[in-house]
Amino acid sequence: MATLNPRDVVIVDGVRSAMGKSKNGMFRNVRADSLSAELVRALIARNQFDVNEVEDLIWGCVNQTLEQGMNIGRNIGLLAGLPKTVAGQTVNRLCGSSMQAIHTAAAQIATNQGDIFIIGGVEHMGHVGMMHGIDLNPEASKHYAKASNMMGLTAEMLGRMNGITREEQDTFGVESHRRAWAATQEGRFKNEIIGVEGHDANGFKILCDIDEVIRPDANLEAFKALKPVFDPKGGSVTAATSSALSDGASAMLLMSAERAQALGLKPRAVIRSMAVAGCDAAIMGYGPVPATQKALKRAGLSIADIQTVELNEAFAAQGLSVLKGLGLYDKQDIVNLNGGAIALGHPLGCSGARITTTLLNVMEQQDTQIGLATMCIGLGQGIATVIERV
């Protein structure tokens, strides 16, 4: 177990909503800010501390318009009933937004600019489309190809560069669903999912506490029958080996080690290191490799020291390419043990804190000590966080 210093950044708790389908899904009548506020209230209820001590609520969100606009972070805090003296901000690093929220809060704690932070992220992709209101500068084409904005084509590029076959991708996708459904049936998500009121297909109110995107019947034959969607003539990436459009939120409670101790709260993990890195936009999915390498170096670790990994699965071709790049291709038995975004979906701003929360729970379930959460980011970035149980 890790020995803590007073200003070490500890994770006290982490929760998430179930993941809903973006098209006519269970959260179709639930707003992004309301969904997030439910998690903040649950996080507070699960942990005894004075909410007046919260320095800031930091929320990741990508498409900050419509119901996700006007600093959704501040709105979430007010909706959740936090004192008006608690500040709120919204951060955007595209797919890595809520992991960036972790990093932002951690940096403030480490430099003595606050002791308690609530962080999280949300994306309601059913209400706010991925490209809603986007107006990219035509001059940007000098620096990256327009096709680099099409995430599926970047996955095709990575797959070809790293020799990832269609069969490998299909197998990876089916396994993601199998693991996620097994985790659901065995109750491995119960400690992280907070049930939120939504609606079933008939419009009746239900408590949504099971991920809606998982396909229990996923099988190799069905996956093999699908045609490539991004490069119809020579491609290998299909809808089944891409992360689903989904709606969801996540939240975490971070503190300084000394404040958690003073409050009698037992930390679940300490943040060992953090990193971000850039790469070519055409292979944006490779970003976790340089980001992880930086984070490992800062922690004085090697990839061999990592016992549990949560890697965002934007696409099977992307995930497998990253595993090859990190030397984890033959260690998939320690990666995404409860399934990944191919099965659970990838609500952009939600995903960073979601995979970190899932990582924490898997580490406890597997009784491992050191874990890595990492993800790719559109336009060529990666982000990584190394945590250790305490």
Curated annotation (Swiss-Prot):
Coiled coil: none annotated. Gene3D superfamilies: 3.40.47.10. One of its GO terms (molecular function) is acetyl-CoA C-acyltransferase activity. GO terms for cellular component: cytoplasm. GO terms for biological process: fatty acid beta-oxidation; phenylacetate catabolic process. InterPro entries: FadA (IPR012805), Thiolase (IPR002155), Thiolase-like (IPR016039), Thiolase-like_sf_Thiolase (IPR050215), Thiolase_acyl_enz_int_AS (IPR020615), Thiolase_AS (IPR020610), Thiolase_C (IPR020617), Thiolase_CS (IPR020613). HAMAP family: FadA (MF_01620). This is 3-ketoacyl-CoA thiolase. It comes from Acinetobacter baumannii (strain ATCC 17978 / DSM 105126 / CIP 53.77 / LMG 1025 / NCDC KC755 / 5377). The gene is fadA.
